[in-house]
Amino acid sequence: MAKLIIPSDYDPKMTIRETEKAIRYIRETFQTEFGTAMNLERISAPMFVKKSSGLNDNLSGWEKPVSFTLHDGNEGELQIVHSLAKWKRWALKHYGFSHGEGLFTNMNAIRKDEEVLDNLHSVYVDQWDWEKVIDKSERTEATLRQTVQRIFETIKGMEYHVRALYPQAAYHLPEEISFVTSEELEARWPSLTPSEREDKICQEKGAVFLEHIGGALPLSKKPHDLRAPDYDDWTLNGDLLFWYEPLQRAFEVSSMGIRVDEDRLQEQLKLAGAEDRLDLPFHQALLKGDLPYSIGGGIGQSRLCMLLLGKAHIGEVQASIWPDEIVEKCQAAKIQLL
């Protein structure tokens, strides 16, 4: 399904070549400042993993990854990654990262089953996937919120950099971020859909970290949004959202969380009806205590560029494939798809 929001009287303010230069600047500058602020080291990341490893991100549970086999077939089915959520935790262990240290990667993924292709969603996903070692005693809301605050401040700092170089295009971000839970949103707006609740709270607050994604809510008995049961702890995770004036909607830049421990892994797999995953190598390692406790997430590279440059469509900051109807409408509205 394809949906498109056309801002009235849209003016891109930058040529395609100017946009490309700005994209490069944002990507290079942000990853340096983000890595420094979070004590993260950049490492290489796989484009595909073995299906049998259990390392791929199952997302909501129904999306099928792009898969293939090698010529001799000896390695079994290989899958293009959806994200590196579980692989990163494995890498923390095998690359020798210690408490307080972490990694980030330049992650590229294909999500062929993306339900809606719109201003924010593409089948091509590029993000800074990151993971950091913590102690079990740090598996707390305080740790989560401190980390969110640090990421928000790094993004806010990027706004000042972009405004200095591209004052005609830079989008103004709020000065502060608010914290709210999905349960609080449901209680306040029970008749609205989860996405409508996000729009409401973001328009009110400007920037929000929405906590508790994945578990069933008290009133609806349904989760605010689906989340894989074997990486985030659903009680210690969330999405970083901004109110985005050009599209008049909430704008997600990052999803992150404190990762499951041995107990939460088993609890969430049972709730999801996915206990068969416990036999996979990744899950066995976690149950045996062979993997570190960690916090991690992903920050959308194209999303961040789009936000900071005030673009109307993610296709203005990444090269992807779009339905002909969207391409034609974008051309008519001066939206310059790459």
UniProtKB/Swiss-Prot annotation:
Pathway: Amino-acid biosynthesis; L-asparagine biosynthesis; L-asparagine from L-aspartate (ammonia route): step 1/1. SUPFAM superfamilies: Class II aaRS and biotin synthetases. One of its GO terms (cellular component) is cytosol. InterPro entries: aa-tRNA-synth_II (IPR006195), aa-tRNA-synth_II/BPL/LPL (IPR045864), AsnA (IPR004618). One of its GO terms (biological process) is L-asparagine biosynthetic process. Its EC number is 6.3.1.1. One of its GO terms (molecular function) is transferase activity. Keywords: Amino-acid biosynthesis, Asparagine biosynthesis, ATP-binding, Cytoplasm, Ligase, Nucleotide-binding. It is an enzyme of class 6 (ligase). It is found in: Cytoplasm. CDD domains: AsnA. Signal peptide: none annotated. It holds the Pfam family AsnA. It catalyses: L-aspartate + NH4(+) + ATP = L-asparagine + AMP + diphosphate + H(+). PANTHER family: ASPARTATE--AMMONIA LIGASE. Belongs to the class-II aminoacyl-tRNA synthetase family. AsnA subfamily. This is Aspartate--ammonia ligase.
